[in-house]
């Protein structure tokens, strides 16, 4: 099993799909990495040589991925909340921040419905 950026890549998957197991790498970026390394998208992870895996690691090192990306995203949201802007306020309240209606819908962001008894108290 290949290990890239601290993630075990499933060996039975194609290179393009297997690389998407890494947080921060989607299909488009995976294709660009494969192109830069000269690897066919359809080549299975288990068929890659150690040299191929090393090339992939070098390419991936150029991007912000996994823990660093998660930390950066969290810090960006925290910054919005600290400066007190509208988007930060919506994040703090757990509401949608891109203008969607909230009188009805927005259940994913707001969580499960509160019963009528809970509202009357």
From Swiss-Prot:
The keyword Transferase does not apply. One of its GO terms (molecular function) is rRNA binding. The keyword rRNA-binding applies. PROSITE patterns: RIBOSOMAL_S13_1, RIBOSOMAL_S13_2. Keywords: Ribonucleoprotein, Ribosomal protein, RNA-binding, rRNA-binding, tRNA-binding. One of its GO terms (biological process) is translation. Part of the 30S ribosomal subunit. Forms a loose heterodimer with protein S19. Forms two bridges to the 50S subunit in the 70S ribosome. The lineage of its organism: Bacteria, Pseudomonadati, Pseudomonadota, Betaproteobacteria, Burkholderiales. This is Small ribosomal subunit protein uS13. The gene is rpsM. Belongs to the universal ribosomal protein uS13 family. Located at the top of the head of the 30S subunit, it contacts several helices of the 16S rRNA. In the 70S ribosome it contacts the 23S rRNA (bridge B1a) and protein L5 of the 50S subunit (bridge B1b), connecting the 2 subunits; these bridges are implicated in subunit movement. Contacts the tRNAs in the A and P-sites. It holds the Pfam family Ribosomal_S13. Residues 93-121 are annotated as: Disordered. It comes from Paracidovorax citrulli (strain AAC00-1) (Acidovorax citrulli). One of its GO terms (cellular component) is small ribosomal subunit.
């Amino acid at each position: 099993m290949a290990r890239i950026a601290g993630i075990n890549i499933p060996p039975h998957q194609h290179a393009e799909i297997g690389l998407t197991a890494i947080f921060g790498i989607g299909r488009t970026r995976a294709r660009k990495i494969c192109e830069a390394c000269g690897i066919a998208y359809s080549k299975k992870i288990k068929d890659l040589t150690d040299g191929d895996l090393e090339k992939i690691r070098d390419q991936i090192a150029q991007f912000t991925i996994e823990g660093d990306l998660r930390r950066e995203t969290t810090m960006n949201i925290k910054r919005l909340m600290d400066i007190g802007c509208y988007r930060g306020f919506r994040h703090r309240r757990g509401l949608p921040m891109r203008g969607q209606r909230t009188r009805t819908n927005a259940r994913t962001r707001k969580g499960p419905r509160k019963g009528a008894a809970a509202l009357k108290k």
